[in-house]
């Protein structure tokens, strides 16, 4: 009988000590923590405009901002665009690009400021390279399908333009209430 009581007492003390250790606070500093992630495969490219492969996009979506982004509730909020307006007919979207955003080299050196012209250049690049995710906007933006299909070689006919360094404008073929959700990507 005494042996079983001793075992119970020992088990109780051991359980209590585990509980105390589990509930105790640690003294680690949040600044000392590093997030690490192991990818199943190497990315095929870091060209975020032309590739939609999972191994690429899981990296590039953390490096490149779209005009808008989703907040934790799924609402569209400003990202590279600090504000935007939509014409009354729903065909023209005008975005004010956030000033002070920078491009950086692979070595982390500041390269240039992000401007509206970069978004125009990015869309032309995606169209010229027949980017995998171009289908998301190809039939939405005025003239883009004709440019991609070779019916015109003049990119000026495509409904995207930099009004000035920090104003970007898209003209659509028809109103799309969900257009802004297409601007969360990099082009």
Where are these regions (language model features)?
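Bacterial N-terminal signal peptides that target proteins for export
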Residues: 1-9
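Solvent-exposed coil/turn segments that connect beta secondary-structure elements
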Residues: 40-43, 51, 72-73, 89-91, ...
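Surface-exposed binding/hinge segments that line
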Residues: 118, 127-187
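Second-shell loop/turn segments in exported
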Residues: 49-52, 101-110, 156-159
């Amino acid at each position: 009988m005494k042996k079983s009581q001793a075992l119970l007492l020992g088990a109780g003390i051991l359980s209590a000590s585990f509980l105390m250790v589990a509930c105790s606070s640690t003294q680690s500093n949040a600044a000392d923590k590093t997030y690490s992630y192991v990818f199943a495969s190497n990315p095929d490219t870091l060209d975020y405009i032309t590739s939609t492969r999972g191994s690429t996009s899981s990296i590039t979506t953390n490096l490149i901002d779209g005009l808008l982004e989703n907040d934790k509730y799924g609402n569209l909020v400003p990202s590279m665009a600090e504000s935007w307006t939509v014409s009354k007919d729903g065909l023209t979207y005008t975005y004010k690009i956030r000033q002070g955003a920078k491009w950086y080299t692979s070595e982390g050196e500041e390269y240039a400021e992000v401007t509206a012209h970069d978004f125009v250049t990015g869309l032309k690049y995606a169209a010229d390279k027949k980017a995998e995710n171009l289908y998301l906007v190809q039939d939405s933006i005025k003239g883009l399908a004709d440019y991609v299909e070779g019916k015109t070689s003049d990119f000026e006919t495509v409904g995207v333009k930099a009004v000035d360094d920090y104003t970007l404008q898209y003209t659509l073929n028809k109103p799309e209430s969900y257009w802004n959700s297409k601007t969360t990507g990099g082009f």
